[in-house]
């Protein structure tokens, strides 16, 4: 197997979170941005895309922005939500910002956000 084939196999095995982290690491190392360059020729395509109906988002990601002052309560809630062990939940809370739940429905994401905020955390939904 060639180097490139091995690289493709390794990259294909990454999770979405690992791929996003890899992207950020490469941006920092190479001093570039993954944002698409804006071109004048792209303007007509953008106008056509704007005319298309906007689909409502159905899957949400709950992100723990900050563990807050009551980290023990937040760790308990994170464990209840994610079924993580004590150490993993503690690492997640102390390593904020971190993703708590991916692919959640709108209601589920709102419920998780409410639980974590009541425990003292700062939470964002994307």
Curated annotation (Swiss-Prot):
InterPro entries: Ribosomal_bL12, Ribosomal_bL12_C, Ribosomal_bL12_C/ClpS-like, Ribosomal_bL12_oligo, Ribosomal_bL12_oligo_N_sf. GO terms for biological process: translation. The keyword DNA-binding does not apply. GO terms for cellular component: cytosolic large ribosomal subunit. Keywords: Ribonucleoprotein, Ribosomal protein. GO terms for molecular function: mRNA binding; structural constituent of ribosome. It comes from the Bacteria. Signal peptide: none annotated. Forms part of the ribosomal stalk which helps the ribosome interact with GTP-bound translation factors. Is thus essential for accurate translation. Homodimer. Part of the ribosomal stalk of the 50S ribosomal subunit. Forms a multimeric L10(L12)X complex, where L10 forms an elongated spine to which 2 to 4 L12 dimers bind in a sequential fashion. Binds GTP-bound translation factors. Belongs to the bacterial ribosomal protein bL12 family. PANTHER family: 39S RIBOSOMAL PROTEIN L12, LARGE RIBOSOMAL SUBUNIT PROTEIN BL12M. This is Large ribosomal subunit protein bL12.
């Amino acid at each position: 197997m060639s180097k490139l084939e091995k690289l493709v196999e390794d990259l294909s095995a990454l999770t979405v979170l690992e791929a996003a982290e890899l992207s950020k690491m490469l941006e920092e190392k190479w001093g570039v941005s993954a944002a698409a360059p804006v071109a004048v020729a792209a303007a007509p395509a953008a106008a056509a895309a704007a005319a298309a109906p906007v689909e409502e988002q159905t899957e949400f990601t709950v992100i723990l922005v900050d563990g807050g002052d009551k980290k023990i309560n937040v760790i308990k809630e994170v464990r209840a939500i994610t079924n993580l062990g004590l150490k993993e939940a503690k690492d997640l809370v102390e390593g904020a910002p971190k993703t708590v739940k991916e692919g959640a429905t709108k209601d589920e994401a709102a419920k998780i956000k409410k639980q974590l905020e009541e425990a003292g955390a700062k939470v964002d939904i994307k």
